[in-house]
C-alpha cells in the first residue's frame, strides 16, 4: 500500500503497531524488538522505566526519543489523582503532552476503573494534555471519553498481560463504528492472529507489550506482529466476503460437460 498512514492529535504515523517497553530481558532486546516491529511509537511506564537517572541504564540509551515517538503511560495508577500527577511529571521530564492514560480498578484483573478514567481524562484535557485512553470495551463509555476530549480510544481486547486474544469483537466493532477519533486495541493480544483480527475489525492500530516480550523469541514475534498488522489492515481495506449459512461452489457447473 502506497500511503496508508493514520493520525492522532496532529501526529501522523505509518506503522499501526505500538510496542511497549516492559518485561524484556534488557533494554537491548527491547530495542531490537521495537526495530523488528517497525514501530514508530513506544509506550513507556513513567513509574517503572528509568528515563532520568543517568547513573543507571536508561531506556533512552537504546531507544532514541528523536527517532521514536515516546508515549508516556500511567501503568500502576489506581485513581485519577495518581494518574494525573504521573503525567505532570512526564511533561516536566520530557515535555510530553501526547500521553496514554490508564487508571486501573484492581490489581487482580487490571481492569480499567472507568469512573476514575473519565475524571482523569477531563482534568488532563483542561491542562493541555492529549490523552489516548485505555478503557473497557463499552461503546457508551468510549463515546463519553471522546466527548471529554480523548484523542484516541483504547479498549482492551482482554485483561492486560493475559494473552487471551480479542474476547469481545462485536463491542470493539461498535466502538469503531461510532468513534470520530482513532481506536486502538490495547491489552490482551497473545499472538499474531489476534493482531490481525484487531485491524480486520477496523481498528486504527494495536498496542502490545507482553505478547512480544514474553515470546520465546521476542524479536521474531515482533516481526510476526508487524506482518499480522499489515495483513489485517489490507484485509479490512479489501473488504471480506459475506458470511453464508450454506455452501456456495467455487466452480459453477453451468456450461460444462
From Swiss-Prot:
GO terms for molecular function: thiazole synthase activity. Keywords: Cytoplasm, Schiff base, Thiamine biosynthesis, Transferase. The keyword Cytoplasm applies. 1-deoxy-D-xylulose 5-phosphate binds at residues 161, 187-188, 209-210. Its EC number is 2.8.1.10. Pathway: Cofactor biosynthesis; thiamine diphosphate biosynthesis. Catalyzes the rearrangement of 1-deoxy-D-xylulose 5-phosphate (DXP) to produce the thiazole phosphate moiety of thiamine. Sulfur is provided by the thiocarboxylate moiety of the carrier protein ThiS. In vitro, sulfur can be provided by H(2)S. Belongs to the ThiG family. HAMAP family: ThiG. Homotetramer. Forms heterodimers with either ThiH or ThiS. This is Thiazole synthase. It comes from Zymomonas mobilis subsp. mobilis (strain ATCC 31821 / ZM4 / CP4).
Amino acid at each position: 500500500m502506497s500511503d496508508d498512514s493514520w493520525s492522532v492529535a496532529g501526529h501522523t504515523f505509518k506503522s499501526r503497531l505500538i510496542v511497549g517497553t516492559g518485561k524484556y530481558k534488557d533494554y537491548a532486546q527491547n530495542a531490537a524488538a521495537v526495530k523488528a516491529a517497525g514501530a514508530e511509537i513506544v509506550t513507556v511506564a513513567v513509574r517503572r522505566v528509568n528515563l532520568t537517572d543517568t547513573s543507571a541504564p536508561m531506556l533512552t540509551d537504546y531507544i532514541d526519543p528523536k527517532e521514536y515517538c515516546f508515549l508516556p503511560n500511567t501503568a500502576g495508577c489506581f485513581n485519577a489523582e495518581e494518574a494525573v500527577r504521573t503525567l505532570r511529571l512526564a511533561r516536566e521530564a520530557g515535555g510530553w503532552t501526547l500521553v496514554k492514560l490508564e487508571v486501573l480498578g484492581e490489581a487482580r484483573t487490571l481492569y480499567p476503573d472507568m469512573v476514575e478514567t473519565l475524571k482523569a481524562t477531563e482534568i488532563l484535557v483542561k491542562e493541555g494534555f492529549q490523552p489516548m485512553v485505555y478503557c473497557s470495551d463499552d461503546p457508551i463509555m468510549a463515546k463519553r471519553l471522546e466527548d471529554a476530549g480523548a484523542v484516541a480510544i483504547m479498549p482492551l481486547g482482554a485483561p492486560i498481560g493475559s494473552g487471551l486474544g480479542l474476547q469481545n469483537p462485536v463491542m470493539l466493532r461498535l466502538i469503531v463504528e461510532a468513534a470520530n477519533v482513532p481506536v486502538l486495541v490495547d491489552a490482551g493480544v497473545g499472538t499474531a492472529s489476534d493482531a490481525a483480527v484487531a485491524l480486520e475489525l477496523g481498528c486504527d492500530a494495536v498496542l502490545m507489550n507482553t505478547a512480544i516480550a514474553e515470546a520465546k523469541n521476542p524479536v521474531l514475534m515482533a516481526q510476526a506482529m508487524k506482518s499480522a498488522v499489515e495483513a489485517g489492515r489490507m484485509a479490512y481495506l479489501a473488504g471480506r466476503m459475506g458470511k453464508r449459512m450454506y455452501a456456495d461452489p467455487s466452480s459453477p457447473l453451468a456450461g460444462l460437460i
